[in-house]
Amino acid sequence: MIFTQLIQTNLRTKELGKNIEYYNRLDSTNTEAWELIEEGNQHGTVIVTDNQTIGRGRMKNTWSMIPGKGVAFSLIIENCFPSNYSGLISLASGIAVVESLNKRGIETKLKWPNDVFANEKKLGGILSETKIIKDKIVKVVIGVGINVNETIAEHPKDIRDYMTTMLEISKHPHQRELIIAEFINSIEHLFHDISIDPKILINKWLNNCLHLDKIISFYENEIIVEGIFSGLDSNGFAKIEMNNEIKTFGSINLV
């Protein structure tokens, strides 16, 4: 069981995490977050579960969680950002996960735009969703899933070769509440970076990028193509060198 009081005891935030909604079981914490928004839940609310059964990822991907061992939570943000800041919000979420796990002794890297890797294998993922009204982002839901205290063998066979867990890396269990608390602490500070100077955020992300200046493969018009990941533009979009030309992509699926 996740103890919400332990999360709040370890918060150093001014706004985020003051209200935490815990559920034994949920289809998706992001889905529940949007339902709570419709019911009037406010900025900073955290939705956390011990058993997420239909975790959602980008491009209709799903997320496998082992009940009582992984981390699955969502954070509601109510703020007015320009509509082109969606990519920056996703970057901030990734950095917050890296900073949180670093405090637990787990060195991680980010695969654009939202995957968290350790030892070249997937450790976690992020799904950021926004509601835009009149060219302004007015609602944000950030969903985070991390493999924590399970073994690789507990996951489906078809993904075992490509994923890892904090337990497998460190050889000891981790307090899941502290991971969540540190993420919330980090993300509040990172949103301040967005409002002051997005370049600060972009540089932080690039410093933690798994594949900067490396050849990557991705789908373009349902065909796998290759290019060199050369950085990010001011909106957090990927800059990829293809045939000696830099192309910018706001949404692609890296292989």
Task: Locate the predicted segments by residue.
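Long, positively charged amphipathic alpha-helical accessory segments at protein N-termini or as interdomain linkers
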Residues: I2, L6, E15-L16, L91-T108, ...
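Short loop/edge segments at beta-strand edges and connector loops
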Residues: N24, L110-W112
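N-terminal lobe of the biotin/lipoate ligase/transferase fold
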Residues: M1-S100
